[in-house]
C-alpha cells in the first residue's frame, strides 16, 4: 500500500496554508451556502474534483521523489502545472510559494502519519502551518 488512504492530510494542508480546500470544507460541512454562486463555483462538486484530481496527480509525482523527503523546494514544473490546473478558482490568487509550503508541509505530515499508522494532525491557519502531535 502506498498510504493514499491518508491523503486527506493534503486537503488539511491546503485549508491551513492556502486557506482553500473545497474537499475539507465539504467534510466539515462548512460550505458557503449564503452565496449560491460561491457555493456552486468554489465549494461545489467541480471544485472538489479539481482538488481531488490535483491531489492525486501530485501524489503520483511525489512517488518518484521519495514523497518529497529531503526536499526544500517543489519542482517548478509541478508548481506551474498547479497554477494552470486551478485557473478560474479563488485559489489561483495564491502565490506558488504558498503552494510549495502546502505540499512540503503536507508531505512531511503524510510521511509521519504513514510511518506511524496514524496520528493527530494540528493546523494553524494564522501561521499557515500543520504538524503531527
Say what each PLM segment does.
Residues 1-6, 10, 17, 22-133:
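Metalloprotease/metallohydrolase-associated module, dominated by Zn2+-dependent proteases
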Amino acid at each position: 500500500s502506498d498510504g493514499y488512504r491518508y491523503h486527506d492530510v493534503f486537503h488539511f494542508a491546503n485549508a491551513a496554508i492556502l486557506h482553500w480546500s473545497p474537499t475539507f470544507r465539504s467534510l466539515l460541512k462548512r460550505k458557503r451556502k449564503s452565496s449560491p454562486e460561491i457555493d456552486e463555483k468554489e465549494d461545489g462538486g467541480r471544485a472538489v474534483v479539481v482538488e481531488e484530481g490535483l491531489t492525486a496527480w501530485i501524489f503520483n509525482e511525489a512517488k518518484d521523489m521519495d514523497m518529497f523527503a529531503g526536499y526544500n523546494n517543489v519542482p517548478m514544473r509541478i508548481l506551474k502545472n498547479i497554477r494552470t490546473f486551478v485557473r478560474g478558482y479563488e485559489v489561483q490568487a495564491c502565490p506558488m510559494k504558498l503552494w510549495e509550503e502546502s505540499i512540503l508541509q503536507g508531505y512531511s505530515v503524510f510521511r509521519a502519519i504513514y510511518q506511524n499508522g496514524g496520528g493527530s494532525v494540528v493546523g494553524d491557519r494564522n501561521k499557515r502551518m500543520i504538524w503531527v502531535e
